């Protein structure tokens, strides 16, 4: 097994772990609401009976159904969600392309040939004044890479190729699944927790139901921090891997370093917070300027790249 195959395998394990974690949290929230619903006197006994189906866990089953439906819907529509909010154009090779569009497509084909990859992501240009890029798609067959028009205009050929190589590495490592699962399911989970607290309380007097209510209140407070930590752990790891993947494909770490520096300087000199408010897409961007970003700092990414022996 090659180094990149190991990375892909590790990311698959992480993806499954993330999905399992969310399913467990969904189930736990559902079980707590079921305890309140049946007005249980003993929390432990009630949880055992619900988990062994001695009492049917109605709310828990609804939670699992919601989780399943959300995942399926997101798989089918994730690319359109990522592209929403801005004017974007597909680089369609069956039509006449501009010189810049031709250049981007040629760079992608070069990388695919050099890496011996047998799939071709769709290429999109997003009409935006900020410099950024992202990849999307559940797997290689429905993948895409999107670059902003500002990025295309301000980077040189090698820097553009390095950015495309970075996004291509995300696709190779199955990182997009992590972005999808963590970004969207985090929001759904928080909504479920809030919904449970405000709509399933009722006037319960038994101790088990009251304890379940207290746990739900605590979860409502800590879940935002838990999901943020989970996003940061997974996303920062995959950004380092994608940077290394770009350097590996380019046989040179300098173009990726220059691209990161230019993008970082662009965000330092301009305020783009009010322009792009797609939170799902921001988690997948090559660069994220927020203080509590899921991405590692540019300084740390450049230091990591400089340690990369080509």
From Swiss-Prot:
Q: List keywords of the entry alphabetically.
A: Cell inner membrane, Cell membrane, Hydrolase, Membrane, Metal-binding, Metalloprotease, Protease, Transmembrane, Transmembrane helix, Zinc
Q: Which residues bind Zn(2+)?
A: 166, 170, 239
Q: Where is the active site?
A: 167
Q: What is its EC number?
A: 3.4.24.-
Q: Report the membrane topology from the UniProt record.
A: Multi-pass membrane protein
Q: What does the record list as coiled-coil region(s)? A: none
Q: Which Pfam families match?
A: Peptidase_M48
GO: which molecular function terms? metalloendopeptidase activity; zinc ion binding
Compartments where located = Cell inner membrane
GO annotations of cellular component type:
plasma membrane
Keyword Hydrolase among UniProt keywords: yes
Bilayer-crossing regions: 16-36, 55-75, 182-202, 214-234
Any binding details for the cofactor? Binds 1 zinc ion per subunit.
Which InterPro entries does the record associate with it? HtpX_protease, Pept_M48_protease_HtpX, Peptidase_M48
NCBIfam families linked? PRK02870.1 (NF002775)
Family listed: Belongs to the peptidase M48B family.
Protein name, entry field = Protease HtpX homolog
Species name: Helicobacter pylori (strain ATCC 700392 / 26695)
């Amino acid at each position: 097994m090659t180094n990149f195959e190991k990375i892909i395998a590790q990311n698959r394990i992480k993806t499954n772990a993330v999905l399992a974690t969310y399913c467990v949290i969904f189930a736990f929230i559902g079980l707590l609401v079921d305890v309140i619903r049946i007005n249980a006197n003993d929390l432990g006994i009630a949880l055992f009976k619900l988990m062994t189906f001695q009492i049917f866990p109605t709310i828990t089953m609804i939670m699992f159904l919601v989780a399943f439906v959300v995942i399926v819907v997101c798989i089918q529509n994730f690319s359109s969600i990522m592209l929403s909010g801005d004017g974007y154009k597909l680089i369609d090779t069956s039509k006449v392309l501009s010189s810049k569009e031709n250049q981007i497509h040629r760079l992608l084909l070069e990388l695919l040939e050099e890496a011996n990859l047998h799939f071709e992501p769709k290429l999109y240009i997003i009409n935006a004044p900020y410099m950024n890029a992202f990849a999307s798609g559940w797997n290689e067959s429905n993948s895409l890479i999107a670059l902003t028009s500002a990025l295309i205009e301000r980077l040189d050929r090698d820097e553009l190729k390095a950015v495309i190589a970075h996004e291509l590495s995300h696709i190779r490592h199955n990182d997009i699944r992590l972005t999808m699962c963590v970004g969207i399911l985090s929001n759904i989970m928080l909504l479920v927790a809030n919904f449970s607290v405000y709509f399933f309380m009722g006037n319960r007097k038994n101790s088990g139901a009251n304890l379940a209510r207290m746990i739900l209140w605590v979860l409502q407070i800590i879940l935002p921090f838990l999901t943020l930590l989970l996003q940061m752990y997974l996303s920062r790891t995959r950004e380092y891997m994608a940077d290394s993947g770009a350097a590996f494909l380019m046989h040179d770490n300098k173009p990726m370093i220059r691209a990161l520096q230019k993008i970082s300087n662009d965000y330092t000199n301009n305020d783009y917070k009010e322009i792009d408010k797609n939170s799902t897409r921001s988690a997948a961007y090559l660069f994220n300027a927020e203080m509590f970003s899921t991405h590692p700092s540019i300084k740390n990414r450049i230091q990591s790249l400089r340690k990369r022996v080509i």
